[in-house]
């Protein structure tokens, strides 16, 4: 049976193909997570986004906490969001979604050349876990080249990380690999508030010895995964020193808290696609808060 298209329909079909371009075999993804407290946005955003070495990732997702979210108009977002927008627009990016709550934000950008009308049919949900709205998460999901991407950020309390009581709230409602139509590429970034379960003196001793593996043996994320929170999610190998808790504007740990990796990046495919971590590092030049930001770079195969 032959399918005949009108001239108008044929033209629309061709224009649609041209708008999206031929699908590449792979796309690059950068994710950034930073609990910044209430400090002003930094001026050097290129390093924060992983653009300082001439890279042009196809997708950039930024999860932030702080930067003055507790304002009279939190929906307008912190100043850093505007700064991201100004920088990335000049480099050919389009903002797909910017979601701000009282305690966190998630902003996703994509190179404009990859976008078509289907990409803009994105979905965002906000999950609140406690009555004070301090714990919860955001998910933004969208489609590029018929592949579904989902980015999740969450802000957890100390109890959330190891409690089975919050498994439903986080794992079931925020994990888009468990939907009837699972996402192909999923990334979970943010301040997971994961701590190291040893005393500060012992942790500092292991840091001074650069014994990262030894310190990671006490990491709460391992326990959380044993309790099936973040079930099936993978983290790139951690080779950098703990990102919390620093004395602001120094490289010295504040030992009122055990040095820990609070901001994390996890990845997962709901359809068996390949996600390759390329690098995973803390950005030690950003010293103005108790936390160091974490930048992860990935390559996904379409």
From Swiss-Prot:
The N-terminus is blocked. Its cofactor is heme b. Binds 1 heme b (iron(II)-protoporphyrin IX) group per subunit. Heme binds at residue 80. CDD domains: INPP5c. One of its GO terms (biological process) is nitric oxide transport. Has some sequence similarity to inositol phosphatases, but no inositol trisphosphate phosphatase activity is detected. This is Nitrophorin Cim l NP. It comes from Cimex lectularius.
């Amino acid at each position: 049976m032959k399918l005949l298209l009108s001239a108008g329909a044929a033209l629309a079909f061709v224009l649609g193909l041209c708008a999206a371009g031929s699908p590449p075999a792979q796309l690059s993804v950068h994710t950034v997570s930073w609990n910044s407290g209430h400090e002003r946005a930094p001026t050097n955003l290129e390093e924060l986004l992983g653009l300082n070495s001439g890279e042009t990732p196809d997708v950039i997702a930024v999860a932030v906490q702080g930067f003055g979210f507790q304002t009279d108009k939190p929906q307008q977002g912190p100043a850093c969001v505007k700064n991201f927008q100004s920088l990335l627009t000049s480099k050919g990016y389009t903002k797909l979604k910017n979601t701000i709550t009282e305690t966190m934000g998630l902003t996703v950008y994509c190179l404009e050349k990859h976008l078509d009308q289907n990409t803009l049919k994105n979905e965002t949900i906000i999950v609140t876990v406690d009555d004070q709205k301090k714990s919860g998460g955001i998910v933004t999901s969208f489609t590029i080249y018929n592949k579904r991407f989902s980015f999740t950020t969450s802000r957890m309390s100390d109890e959330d990380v190891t409690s089975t009581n919050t498994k439903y709230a986080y794992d079931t409602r925020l994990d888009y690999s468990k939907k009837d139509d699972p996402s192909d590429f999923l990334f979970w970034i943010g301040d997971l508030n994961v701590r190291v379960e040893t005393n500060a003196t012992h942790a500092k001793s292991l840091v001074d010895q650069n014994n990262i593996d030894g310190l990671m043996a006490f990491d709460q994320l391992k326990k959380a995964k044993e309790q099936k929170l973040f079930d099936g999610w993978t983290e790139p190998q951690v080779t950098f020193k703990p990102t919390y808790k620093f004395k602001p504007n120094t490289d010295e740990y504040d030992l009122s808290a055990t040095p820990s990796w609070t901001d994390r990046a996890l990845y997962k495919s709901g359809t068996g696609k390949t996600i390759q971590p390329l690098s995973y590092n803390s950005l030690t030049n950003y010293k103005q808060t108790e936390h160091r930001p974490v930048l992860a770079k990935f390559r996904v195969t379409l």
